[in-house]
Amino acid sequence: MNKQRYKNSYYEVRPIRDLKDMIESCADLFGPRPAFWIKNKHKEPFKAISYSQFRMDILALGTSLMSRGLKGKSIAIIGENSYNWVVAYFACAFGLGVVVPIDRELPAVEIANLINRSGASCLCYSEKLGSKIEEVMPLTTGLEQLVNLNGSVNDVKTPSFFELIEEGKVLMSEGCRDFVDIEVDPDAFFALLFTSGTTGLAKGVMMSQKNLISNVYNMSKFVKVDGSRGLSVLPMHHAYEMTCHIMTGLYQGLEIVICEGLKHIQSNIKEMKVSVMLGVPLIFESVHKHIMRQAKAQGKLDKIEKAIDISRKLKLYNHPGICKGIFKDIHKAFGGNISHFISGGAAINAKVIRDFEAMGFPMFQGYGMTENAPIIAVNRDRCSKADAAGPVMPGTEVKIIDANEEGIGEVICKGPSVMMGYFDDEEATKEAIV
């Protein structure tokens, strides 16, 4: 969308001190409204979990884990996207300790390596990873507690998420407020985010809650999703999904639908009438190809391409309602409610954005990196350019250094979202932060 009158406009946002403050205010503002939609079995309908229940589950889990001596410790979380994964993450955010999200796709040896490097005392894991965790455990040092995030295993060494929730509720009903009353230091080390390691050993990016909420707060001035329903597709251990979708979505009152998996994206969008989806270029390019393949198979490709061309020339992307009527079959296949497709993680082919917009699916992209929590620049949802990453976020400064004759050089940035440094790597920190 490219409504120029919004070029320099900001949405109004409320101040937040830390992630605990954010969720407390969300529970007050949005209490009974759904925060999450989850599905335990494929053929079952999605079930809503309210903002109030989300807050209570965080307090219960945190109270239970704190009673087990985990206050101030590092807690690793690994598993597929799930509500329980998010609750464990925010229990750490409420003051329990340092959170260490880990990629479930890594081999057992690398998972053990990251657990050991982080000094994690607790591992919260998905039952689906049970066999891999059995390989991991003999390779780890320092783990004091295991938590089965979604299983029925109940024993002293490996309590289940549900057992801990009930245990925490009992402790709170008996007057235990040790966890509830923790005051969070927004400047303290909170999250250890391991990079992909594509350039060698994975680096541990150290984040404070101030780093993260600065990203949430400033991004919300450009993009508004309140009252919408978003599909959580990307892995939650990624800063992009966690900060931009989960945190920012909750801050604004989004209903987050936990996707059943990549092969269920379209069916989940349609079933839940999803309006917002964050993804990487590969996802959106695949969806785009699927639409065109279907049109070709139905003998409608020429008609679709001509309609896209006319829509673009007439700038109908500023009038999604008209586009929705022209491309009604495509909109019907996606539930008829899409208001935002947001791409990140890498540059996307601008034609994909232009085609989606011409069909009445507002779409834009941003730019960032884990070390900046992650967003550095992002298009405004009401004024965007298909071939640009967007303006720099409020509070962030960007420079290009060592530029060549064409102006291409290294991008450096400064702002409240810039990481604290690399974990146990003073040399790399000095090279990155000047």
Where do the protein language model's features map onto the residues?
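Conserved pre-ATP/AMP-binding loop-to-beta segment of ANL
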Residues: 31-34, 148, 169-194, 201, ...
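ANL superfamily adenylate-forming
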Residues: 43, 131-185, 291-329
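Conserved AMP-binding A3 loop
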Residues: 48-52, 190-214
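Conserved ATP-dependent adenylate/AMP-binding module captured primarily in the ANL superfamily
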Residues: 104-139, 213-231, 262-276
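Conserved AMP-binding/adenylate-forming
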Residues: 322, 326-434
